[in-house]
Amino acid sequence: MTTAVLPRVGIGVDVHPFAAGRPCWVACLEWPGETGLAGHSDGDVAAHATCDALLTASCLGDLGKVFGTDRPEYAGASGAVLLAETARLLAVGGWVIGNVSVQVIGNRPRMAARREQAQAAMSAALGASVSLSATTTDGLGLTGRGEGLAAIATALVVRA
């Protein structure tokens, strides 16, 4: 009897409030002129949701377990660093990343003009295909009120 290798899917969510005086990093890009996001690392919600989706898909934990506030070496770390480390952990665990789809939710920054650049930056950091979309909540909730930014990611992984 043969056993089929089935893909696994993970979902990740990340939310950060805006924080004046910090640079704004979203999808591994700096967004000059935009208010930054509070967080232990750079607050990159797109990168963080992506890491969380990959870690849960591969049963390697979640964002808080792997990069939590109890890990001083990740204080101020960029989303690109977290993506690269997540990819390394998956490879060591015997997983291959199929792809990731991430959606940024909020009024600002406006992602459309830099979508391809953001996808390329995230894909390069991760070493796998990342697609990016963005939406607003039409004035509803914390993102609609302009209090912060959120992201939801879905990741597909398979055994190496």
Swiss-Prot record:
Residues given in the record as 4-CDP-2-C-methyl-D-erythritol 2-phosphate binding sites: D14, V15, H16, H40, S41, D62, L63, G64, T135, T136, T137, D138, R145
Record EC number: 4.6.1.12
Top-level taxon of origin: Bacteria
Alphabetical UniProt keywords: Isoprene biosynthesis, Lyase, Metal-binding
Gene Ontology BP annotations: isopentenyl diphosphate biosynthetic process, methylerythritol 4-phosphate pathway; terpenoid biosynthetic process
InterPro entries referenced in this protein's UniProt entry, alphabetically: MECDP_synthase, MECDP_synthase_sf
Top-level class of the enzyme under EC nomenclature: lyase
GO MF terms held by the record: 2-C-methyl-D-erythritol 2,4-cyclodiphosphate synthase activity; metal ion binding
Cofactor, how bound (note): Binds 1 divalent metal cation per subunit.
Pathway annotation: Isoprenoid biosynthesis; isopentenyl diphosphate biosynthesis via DXP pathway; isopentenyl diphosphate from 1-deoxy-D-xylulose 5-phosphate: step 4/6
Cofactors demanded by this protein: a divalent metal cation
Catalyzed chemical reaction(s): 4-CDP-2-C-methyl-D-erythritol 2-phosphate = 2-C-methyl-D-erythritol 2,4-cyclic diphosphate + CMP
Residues annotated to bind a divalent metal cation: D14, H16, H48
Marked site: Transition state stabilizer: H40, T136
Keyword Membrane: no
Role played: Involved in the biosynthesis of isopentenyl diphosphate (IPP) and dimethylallyl diphosphate (DMAPP), two major building blocks of isoprenoid compounds. Catalyzes the conversion of 4-diphosphocytidyl-2-C-methyl-D-erythritol 2-phosphate (CDP-ME2P) to 2-C-methyl-D-erythritol 2,4-cyclodiphosphate (ME-CPP) with a corresponding release of cytidine 5-monophosphate (CMP).
NCBIfam families: ispF
Description of how the protein assembles with itself and partners: Homotrimer.
Family stated for the protein in its record: Belongs to the IspF family.
Name of protein: 2-C-methyl-D-erythritol 2,4-cyclodiphosphate synthase
